[in-house]
Regions:
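Active-site phosphate/pyrophosphate-binding segments
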Residues: 259-263, 267-292, 382-505, 578-598
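Acidic/histidine-rich
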Residues: 155-186, 452-478, 513, 520
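Generic C-terminus detector
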Residues: 532, 545-547, 557-598
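Conserved short alpha-helical segments that host acidic/polar catalytic motifs at enzyme active sites
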Residues: 1-245, 249, 264-268, 273-287, ...
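Extended hydrophobic-aromatic, low-complexity segments
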Residues: 181, 302-303, 349-352, 446, ...
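Glycine-rich phosphate-binding loops that contact phosphosugars or nucleotide phosphates
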Residues: 283-429, 462, 509-555, 573, ...
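Glycine-rich oxoanion-binding loops at beta->alpha junctions
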Residues: 66, 70-83, 269-283, 307-342, ...
Length: 598
């Protein structure tokens, strides 16, 4: 959620910090700040609001130094304000700290420090740590940070520098992501590799409990007891251009348009029987007695799609679980179960906690993630990477499509009897099918003009189409701020039909041929109440086309692939409705790209 950037090396830190913070804007934030040290003094500049406010403030700045740290804050303790923005000083301005996550026992620590007459300028838990570092200074920054960290409860990542030990940065990870970028005589820190990718593709993903001491462009890793540890350097194969808009107005729009290209990477090398790119083969898959799919938000909706596929090909029960609820209801998980955890970032805190529960019960854990080296990738027994490149827009598009395709690939490799009724050769044509489906944009743009001022919009579908409807509704509400609700079409008569009135938009996904008659009957029900119906399907149902106000025709394909590409019109609807209403598409209010707190 919050963003961290740090630098040590021969260059001036300010432009590197501001550039890194720019690449972290997509994570969501309400204020931003930087701290730069020349070895004798630490200068902090921070502002509430967008990063541009800070940039304008620093326009004529002549701040110079040897090291620097920067932060974008997402308010948890204290309102958004200049005072609560990071970095924070201690009382003597000897220490500067930035921090992601939550210090759960900060109030008790603060109370103890106040009894000793320490003062606080902000409402944050972060400043409490800065003051405690000053209070417990041992003469060595690494030692002091490790000592204080042992007294902190919570999940967090922190980065500290001090005038008491010049040219030194110490950072630590406690369940909140932190990555070290290794350059030529320079070292970078970030909460997300995308922030430093323009400087280096050599990354070290810190493990929980890792601390790093950075001096003069060099680094050394330690555990919390100051024992040296080593971690492998991983080379990230993302291109810097993939994290840029490439001339488009919004990242989300660019990411919708590039789905044909990125899905080609998702399927590459995975279409041959026995491919080593598939982490669990059929023999092993047949040994599982139950499958748990655990995820949040968009990834959860992708899991709804996977449930039907895996039950069909393996004949075992599949349960799709919200990660935020999973570990609190004492699920009956066994050692012969497979846990499939899905997350674009691989850092979703609730999903990480759910993964720990699965592993405690000796289940085999398979992670579907996009970010190489992420926490879930390292925790899992097996990994299937999505390979869709960096996704910057908060509203997931290409990563969601990658999740659908990733699960389809797994299911097809486990499909002994072709129960999915699709072939590897057909899946190979998916990038071309996506490209053809993208041509619906002009029609969607016109349709969007009919619904962008509506207050309530409903999405319906049956079977796999319901899974797509759920994601379509989420996309619309998270970037347009319109109320959108998805439901299985057969549930309309159990309550929601009471809300349908003249002009109410109802968006129908209808790719499941065996359910077309039932879906069409549900559409007739809402039409009878005056609904404005937008249907998405192929040429299989003239009746549905005839009763719909607008019908988006999908390219000819197998039923399974038609279902997958149905999401593209829904993505376009969300984008163009939000754009017509002038909303902040890439950074919707109150939302963050990667939810790294519980």
């Amino acid at each position: 959620m919050c963003g961290i950037i740090g630098y040590s090396g021969p260059k001036q830190p300010l432009p590197i910090l501001l550039g890194g913070l720019s690449r972290l804007e997509y994570r969501g934030y309400d204020s931003a700040g930087i701290a730069i040290s020349d070895g004798e003094n630490i200068i902090i500049e921070k502002k509430e609001g967008k990063l541009q406010v800070l940039k304008d403030h620093l326009l004529d700045s002549k701040i110079k130094g040897n090291i620097g740290i920067g932060h974008t804050r997402w308010a948890t303790h204290g309102v958004p304000s200049d005072e609560n923005a990071h970095p924070h000083y201690d009382n003597n301005q000897d220490f500067a700290i930035i921090h992601n996550g939550i210090i759960e026992n900060y109030a008790e620590i603060k109370e103890e420090l106040q009894k000793e007459d320490y003062q606080f300028e902000s409402e944050t838990d972060t400043e409490v740590v800065a003051v405690k570092l000053s209070r417990q200074w041992t003469g060595n920054l690494l030692e002091t940070v490790c000592k204080v960290a042992k007294e902190l409860d919570g999940t967090y990542a922190l980065v500290v520098t001090t005038t008491k030990q010049s040219n030194t940065i110490v950072a630590g990870r406690m369940m909140s992501p932190l990555v070290l970028g290794v350059g030529d005589g320079e070292v970078f820190l970030a909460s997300d590799s995308a922030a430093i990718l323009e400087h280096t593709n050599k990354m070290i993903f810190l493990e929980n409990g890792d601390f790093v001491e950075i001096k003069n462009g060099n680094y050394q890793l330690f555990d919390i007891n100051m024992n040296k540890v080593t971690r492998d350097i991983q080379e990230i194969d993302w291109e810097v251009s993939e994290a840029e808009k490439s001339g488009h107005d919004h990242y989300m729009y660019k990411e919708i348009l590039e789905q044909s290209e990125v899905i080609e990477r998702t399927i590459a090398g995975r279409l041959e029987v026995g491919s080593e790119e598939i982490p669990i083969d059929l023999k092993k898959a047949k040994q599982f007695e139950k499958i748990w799919i655990v995820a949040c938000g968009t990834a959860y909706h992708a899991g709804l799609f996977g449930k039907d596929l895996f039950e069909k090909v393996l004949g075992v029960p599949v349960s799709v679980e919200l990660a935020s609820e999973f570990r609190y209801r004492e699920p009956i998980v066994g050692e012969n179960d497979l846990g499939i955890v899905i997350s674009q970032s691989g850092e979703t805190m609730d999903t990480i906690a759910a993964t720990e529960l699965l592993k405690e019960n000796n289940s085999h854990v398979l992670a579907l993630v996009n970010v190489v080296g992420s926490s879930l990738a390292r925790m899992a027994d097996s990994v299937l990477y999505l390979h869709v490149g960096p996704e910057i827009g908060v509203a997931s598009t290409k990563a969601y499509l990658g999740m659908l395709v990733g699960q389809l690939l797994l299911a097809k490799h486990w499909d002994e009897s072709n129960k999915l009724e699709t072939t590897f050769n057909e899946i190979k044509q998916l990038p071309s099918l996506i490209k053809e489906t993208l041509k619906c944009e002009a029609q969607i743009k016109e349709i969007s003009k009919s619904i962008n001022e509506k207050k309530d919009i409903y999405f319906i579908g049956r079977g796999l189409d319901y899974a797509l409807a759920a994601e379509g509704a989420l996309k619309l509400k998270e970037i347009s701020y319109l109320h959108a609700e998805a439901l299985a079409a057969g549930e309309l008569k159990h309550g929601t039909l009471a809300l349908i009135q003249d002009g109410t938009p109802v968006i129908v996904t209808a790719s499941q041929h065996h359910l077309l008659d039932k879906t069409t009957s549900n559409v007739q029900e809402v039409k009878a109440r005056g609904a404005y119906v937008i249907a998405i399907g192929d040429n299989s149902s003239k009746k549905l086309q005839d009763i719909s106000d607008d019908y988006v025709t999908l390219p000819e394909a197998s039923e399974m692939l038609s279902t997958i590409v149905s999401i593209i019109p829904l993505q376009f609807i969300a984008y163009h409705v939000a754009n017509l209403n002038g909303e902040s598409i890439d950074q919707p209010r109150n939302l963050a790209k990667s939810v790294t707190v519980e």
